[in-house]
C-alpha cells in the first residue's frame, strides 16, 4: 500500500470526522436554542396565568384564535371597547408562541375563574366545553354564549365535515346551557328558537366605524395601481362562493374587478372551480383588516356572493364607508341591507340577475348614504358595546 494512498485515506477519515463533529455541534446548538425557546415560552405562559389570578379580570372571553375573521374581530372589539375588565383567552401574545390546540390541551385547566367571574364563549367547542365545566363546578359563575353562525350544508361540498358536526353539536347541546345566550342576527335568533327551542337575546354583530373611517383609497391605488373597480373579499371556501364573482367579471368585460383572499389564484380557479379568470380580474392575496378598508375605499362597489352568513362584517364595513353593495339573497346579508332598503341583492346562482343588480348598484348614490346611517344607529361598535356591557353588569 503506497504512502500516498495511506495519506489520502487518513485525510478522508479526518474530513469525515470534522463533518460529523460539525453536524453534531449544530444539533447541539439547535437543541440549546429549542430548550431556551421552550423555557421562555413556559415562563411567558406562567406569567400570563399568574396575572389572570392576580388581576381577576371580570370577563374571560374566548376562544381567541388570532385569525382575520369576523368572530375574532368581534371578540377583539369587545376587549378594546368595553368599559369592563376583559381578558382574551388565550391572549394574542400566547398564540404567537404556541398553537391554539396546544393551549387547550396543556394550559386552559390552569385558569381558575372566581365566583364573580363572567365567562363569555364564542364558536369554538374547546372553550364552550371549558365554560360549561367551570359553571358546573361553580354555579355562581355567569356564563354568556354568543351564537355567530350555525353550520349549514352550504358550508361544505357535500356532507358535513366531522368538525362542522362537532361544532353544531356543541352549539345545540352545550352552549344552550349558558345563563345568557346572544344571537348576532335576528334571522338566527328565530332559527334557534324554531329549530331547537333555544332562546337568545339579539345583540348584533358590530362594525368598527372608526377603523372604516381611516380607509385611504389613495394608499391602495399607490400600492396596487388599482381604483374604480368592483370588489369582492373572499377565500377558497364553498360558503364564500368566489366562483360567481369570477363569472360576473366574465359577464362584464368593460369593468375592472378585484378579488382579495387567502389562497385564491388563477390556477385554483381553473383547477378547482373549472373556470378561467378573465383579464379584467385582478387576484390579490390575503390582506389585513385595514388593508381591506383601503380596498373598499378605492372600489366603486362591493359584491358579496356568500351562500351563508351570520351577519357579515364585510358588508357592514362597506355600508359604513357609504359604498354601494350587492349581496346574495341569503338571510344574514339580506338582514344587513334591510332586505333591499340599503343595498341590492341577487338570486344566488343567477349570474344575469347578479349583473343587473351590480349595474344598478354602481349607479345608486342614495342607498349608500342611508346605509351608513343604518350602521351608525344599529351596528356601530360604539353602540353595540353598551348593550354587551349591560349584560356584564346584570
Feature locations, PLM:
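Aromatic "clamp/platform" in nucleotide-sugar-dependent glycosyltransferases that forms part
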Residues: 307
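Conserved acidic donor-binding segment of nucleotide-sugar-dependent glycosyltransferases
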Residues: 339-340, 344-351, 359-365
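Acidic anion/phosphate-binding donor-loop and adjacent secondary structure
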Residues: 206-222
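Membrane-proximal helix-turn-helix segments that form the acceptor-binding/catalytic region
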Residues: 162-180
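Conserved donor-binding/catalytic core segment of Leloir-type glycosyltransferases
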Residues: 60, 221-240, 246-252, 258
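Short hydrophobic beta-strand element within catalytic cores of glycosyltransferases
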Residues: 324-327
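A short, well-ordered alpha-helix in the C-terminal region of glycosyltransferases
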Residues: 366-378
Amino acid at each position: 500500500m503506497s504512502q500516498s494512498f495511506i495519506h489520502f485515506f487518513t485525510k478522508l477519515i479526518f474530513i469525515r470526522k470534522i463533518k460529523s463533529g460539525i453536524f453534531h455541534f449544530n444539533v447541539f446548538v439547535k437543541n440549546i436554542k429549542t430548550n431556551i425557546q421552550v423555557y421562555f415560552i413556559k415562563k411567558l405562559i406562567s406569567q400570563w396565568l399568574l396575572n389572570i389570578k392576580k388581576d381577576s379580570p371580570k370577563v374571560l372571553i374566548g376562544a381567541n384564535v388570532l385569525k382575520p375573521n369576523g368572530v375574532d374581530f368581534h371578540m377583539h372589539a369587545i376587549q378594546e371597547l368595553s368599559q369592563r375588565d376583559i381578558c382574551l383567552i388565550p391572549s394574542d401574545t400566547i398564540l404567537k408562541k404556541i398553537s391554539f390546540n396546544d393551549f387547550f390541551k396543556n394550559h386552559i385547566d390552569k385558569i381558575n375563574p372566581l365566583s364573580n367571574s363572567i365567562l363569555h364563549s364564542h364558536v369554538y367547542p374547546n372553550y364552550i366545553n371549558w365554560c360549561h365545566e367551570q359553571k358546573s363546578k361553580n354555579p355562581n359563575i355567569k356564563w354568556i354564549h354568543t351564537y355567530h353562525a350555525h353550520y349549514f350544508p352550504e358550508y361544505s361540498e357535500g356532507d358535513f365535515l366531522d368538525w362542522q358536526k362537532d361544532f353544531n353539536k356543541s352549539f345545540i347541546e352545550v352552549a344552550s346551557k349558558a345563563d345568557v345566550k346572544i344571537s348576532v342576527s335576528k334571522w338566527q335568533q328565530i332559527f334557534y328558537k324554531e329549530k331547537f327551542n333555544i332562546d337568545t337575546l339579539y345583540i348584533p354583530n358590530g362594525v368598527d366605524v372608526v377603523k372604516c373611517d381611516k380607509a385611504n383609497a389613495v394608499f391602495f391605488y399607490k400600492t396596487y395601481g388599482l381604483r374604480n373597480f368592483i370588489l369582492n373579499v373572499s377565500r377558497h371556501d364553498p360558503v364564500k362562493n368566489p366562483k360567481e364573482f369570477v363569472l360576473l367579471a366574465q359577464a362584464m368585460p368593460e369593468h375592472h374587478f378585484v378579488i382579495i383572499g387567502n389562497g385564491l389564484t388563477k390556477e385554483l380557479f381553473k383547477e378547482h372551480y373549472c373556470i378561467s379568470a378573465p383579464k379584467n380580474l385582478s387576484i390579490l392575496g390575503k390582506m389585513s383588516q385595514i388593508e381591506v378598508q383601503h380596498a373598499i375605499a378605492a372600489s366603486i362597489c362591493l359584491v358579496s356572493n356568500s351562500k351563508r352568513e351570520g351577519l357579515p362584517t364585510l358588508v357592514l364595513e362597506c355600508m359604513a364607508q357609504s359604498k354601494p353593495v350587492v349581496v346574495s339573497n341569503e338571510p344574514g346579508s339580506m338582514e344587513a341591507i334591510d332586505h333591499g332598503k340599503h343595498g341590492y341583492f341577487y338570486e344566488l346562482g343567477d349570474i344575469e340577475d347578479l349583473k343587473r343588480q351590480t349595474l344598478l348598484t354602481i349607479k345608486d348614490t342614495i342607498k349608500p348614504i342611508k346605509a351608513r346611517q343604518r350602521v351608525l344607529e344599529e351596528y356601530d361598535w360604539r353602540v353595540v358595546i353598551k348593550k354587551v356591557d349591560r349584560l356584564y353588569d346584570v
